[in-house]
């Protein structure tokens, strides 16, 4: 077995793919189920049993407690009750993105954030040009939202070439989009506030913020207080689904700490040697608490939202009566065409124009491997505004006939948005086919950002994607020294992180430590220490290496542990580039921007660089 083949492993762990949002077959299945229930609702509402559709969803459900009594129709129970779980999941994703996800890098996040804001404003403006006044003008909120579930499924169906970065961009955009839509519901679609229940809701939110301090039973506490908050908001006449967002935002999220994971592994070994209830409880608790409750809830609740809540919501809300009268009325309705224009044209123009502006002015930058034409295809797909659009139809429009016209507009817009996106991806891929993944360096060398050795203006550039726990990368350091000696000032050497945790569980933490050293100008000095002690890469060891190379240990601790988001994102950013290029082994070299294939001993690298002169 060759060294290269010995180091080849499977794809990156999901940590580098925005965690729960990595491409999964369940995403496609959830979107297909949502579509199936949408079609079922339309067929039911237009079948000989159409009357039963209205009767069932309009049936009142009464809940009484002593002298208190509340009545909700089945449809409102779905929209106000079950949909709180949908907004809960959205809120968890929002919190995760801002704390440990794409939105931690403000320059990278700026483009999708501004594009999302434009994608909220431009559709609303276009809608209001069709409906400037009257009751229909209140429905402007219908056109501001993108359906994340359908977006993910539709992107999988269209299958644009190399969609990894586009998918991250669109999901980041969708998070901000959801925040805007939820804010619109809170500010513009809530009236007749009751102050006493609202005060109780504020106290409950304060209590929720303190739950994280409990030593145990935090999950049940979140559930009980969250349900109480839902009731308080309902009584305050604030849309109770916002309780889901409030609870989610107050739930902590963090990346797993290697030390805690290793402690749990030790407990597992102890349990294996001496099985007993005490060890069993300790192992269970250690495993549970090594992952943030935010991520655990996304995993636990998310499938129920995708496969139960959203299909039921679609069944309850998509039942548009498409008789000749409804279709005729919709085809001549400014409400219908305002929704179509807002979603299809507004989303496309707003997102694409804002992205172009941010890139042109330098106020933000697109992620590596992502171009404006790819964003344009994704912007068109963002016109699928199904879930929250139908949700706001029911909130903003009182007349059932006008509601049907609005739903027809949402359905037409979704079909047109999908068709436009498919056409854009097919045409742009045909006119300017993307290069095969991995043959060309996806992100050019940036001396201000990258870790470099040599003259930034050198004619020869050697980029290495490596792993500090990889023994072959450790051996390659000697080869790199020979290559640098051979070429002198004619060579610029660049190191980028590619920690393969599946094979090397301490490699990610080692990369973090090197970034902590980089903050004090000693990146390569720390790298030498890490390669020299590859069998000793616990945090206690790396703190010792930090002292050995003369780092300010307090500052190092702040950078890698207390304020770790910058360090985490830097390592993740390099690893995501490697994922985009479909790299699967270390070390991987790029010679003058082109992937080096073959041996990476000093003589082979020198020959490859000489050929590139």
From Swiss-Prot:
* Cell compartments where the protein resides: Cell membrane
**Membrane-traversing stretches:** 29-49, 81-101, 110-130, 138-158, 168-188, 191-211, 231-251, 300-320, 337-357, 377-397, 408-428
Where is the stretch described as Na(+)/H(+) antiporter NhaA? 1-408
Where is the segment annotated Disordered?
1-23
> What is the membrane topology listed in the Swiss-Prot or TrEMBL record?
Multi-pass membrane protein
Q: Which GO terms describe its cellular component?
A: plasma membrane
Q: Which UniProt keywords apply?
A: Antiport, Cell membrane, Ion transport, Membrane, Sodium, Sodium transport, Transmembrane, Transmembrane helix, Transport
Q: Which GO terms describe its molecular function?
A: oxidoreductase activity; sodium:proton antiporter activity
Please indicate which superkingdom the organism of origin belongs to.
Bacteria
Pfam families listed in its UniProt record: Na_H_antiport_1, Thioredoxin_4
Q: Which reaction does it catalyse?
A: Na(+)(in) + 2 H(+)(out) = Na(+)(out) + 2 H(+)(in)
Per UniProt, residues of the Thioredoxin domain are 409-613
GO biological process entries:
regulation of pH
Function (record text): Na(+)/H(+) antiporter that extrudes sodium in exchange for external protons.
Enumerate the NCBIfam families for this protein.
Answer: NhaA
Q: Which family does it belong to?
A: In the N-terminal section; belongs to the NhaA Na(+)/H(+) (TC 2.A.33) antiporter family.
Mind telling me what this protein is named?
Na(+)/H(+) antiporter NhaA 1
């Amino acid at each position: 077995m060759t060294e290269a083949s010995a180091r080849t492993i499977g794809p990156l762990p999901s940590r580098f793919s925005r965690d729960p949002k990595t491409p999964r077959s369940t995403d496609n299945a959830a979107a297909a189920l949502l579509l199936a229930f949408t079609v079922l609702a339309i067929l039911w509402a237009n079948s000989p049993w159409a009357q039963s559709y209205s009767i069932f969803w309009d049936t009142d459900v009464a809940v009484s407690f002593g002298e208190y009594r509340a009545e909700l129709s089945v449809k409102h129970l779905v929209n106000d009750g079950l949909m709180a779980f949908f907004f809960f999941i959205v809120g968890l994703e929002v919190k995760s993105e801002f704390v440990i996800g794409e939105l931690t890098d403000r320059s990278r996040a700026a483009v999708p954030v501004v594009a999302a804001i434009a994608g909220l404003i431009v559709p609303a403006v276009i809608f209001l040009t069709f409906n400037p006044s009257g009751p229909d003008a209140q429905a402007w909120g219908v056109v501001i939202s993108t359906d994340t579930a359908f977006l993910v499924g539709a992107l999988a169906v269209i299958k644009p070439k190399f969609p990894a970065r586009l998918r991250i961009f669109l999901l980041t955009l969708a998070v901000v989009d959801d925040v805007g839509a939820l804010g619109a519901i809170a500010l513009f679609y809530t009236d007749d506030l009751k102050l006493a229940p609202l005060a109780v809701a504020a106290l409950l939110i304060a209590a929720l913020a303190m739950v994280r301090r409990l030593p145990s039973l935090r999950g049940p506490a979140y559930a009980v207080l969250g349900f109480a908050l839902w009731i308080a908001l309902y009584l305050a006449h604030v849309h109770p689904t916002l309780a889901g967002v409030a609870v989610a935002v107050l739930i902590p999220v963090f990346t797993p700490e290697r030390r805690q994971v290793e402690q749990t592994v030790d407990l597992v070994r102890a349990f294996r040697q001496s099985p007993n209830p005490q060890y069993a409880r300790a192992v269970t608790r250690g495993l549970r608490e090594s992952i943030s409750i935010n991520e655990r809830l996304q995993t636990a609740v998310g499938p129920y939202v995708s496969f139960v809540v959203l299909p039921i919501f679609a069944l309850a809300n998509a039942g548009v009566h498409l008789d000749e009268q409804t279709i005729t009325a919709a085809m001549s309705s400014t409400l219908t065409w305002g929704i179509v224009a807002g979603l299809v044209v507004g989303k496309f123009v707003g997102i694409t124009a804002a992205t172009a502006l941010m890139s042109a002015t330098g106020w933000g930058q697109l992620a590596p491997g992502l171009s404006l034409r790819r964003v344009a295809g994704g912007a068109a797909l963002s016109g699928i505004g199904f879930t929250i659009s139908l949700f706001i139809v029911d909130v903003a429009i009182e007349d059932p006939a006008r509601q049907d016209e609005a739903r027809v507009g949402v359905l037409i817009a979704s079909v047109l948005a999908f068709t436009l996106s498919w056409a854009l991806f097919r045409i742009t891929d045909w006119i300017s086919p993307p290069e095969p993944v991995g043959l060309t360096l996806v992100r050019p060398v940036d001396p201000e950002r990258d870790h470099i050795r040599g003259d930034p203006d050198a004619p020869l550039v050697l980029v290495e994607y490596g792993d500090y726990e990889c023994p072959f990368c450790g051996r390659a350091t000697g080869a790199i020294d020979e290559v640098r000696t051979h070429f002198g000032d004619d060579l610029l050497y660049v190191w980028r992180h590619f920690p393969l945790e599946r094979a090397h569980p301490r490699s990610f933490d080692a990369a973090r430590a090197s970034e902590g050293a980089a903050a004090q100008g000693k990146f390569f000095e720390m790298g030498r220490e890490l390669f020299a002690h590859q069998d000793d890469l616990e945090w206690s060891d790396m703190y010792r290496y930090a002292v050995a190379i003369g780092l300010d240990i307090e500052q190092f601790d702040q950078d890698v542990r207390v304020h770790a988001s910058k360090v985490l994102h830097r390592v993740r950013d390099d690893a995501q580039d490697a994922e985009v290029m479909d790299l699967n082994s270390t070390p991987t070299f790029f010679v003058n921007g082109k992937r080096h294939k073959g041996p990476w001993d000093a003589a082979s690298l020198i020959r490859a660089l000489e050929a590139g002169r």
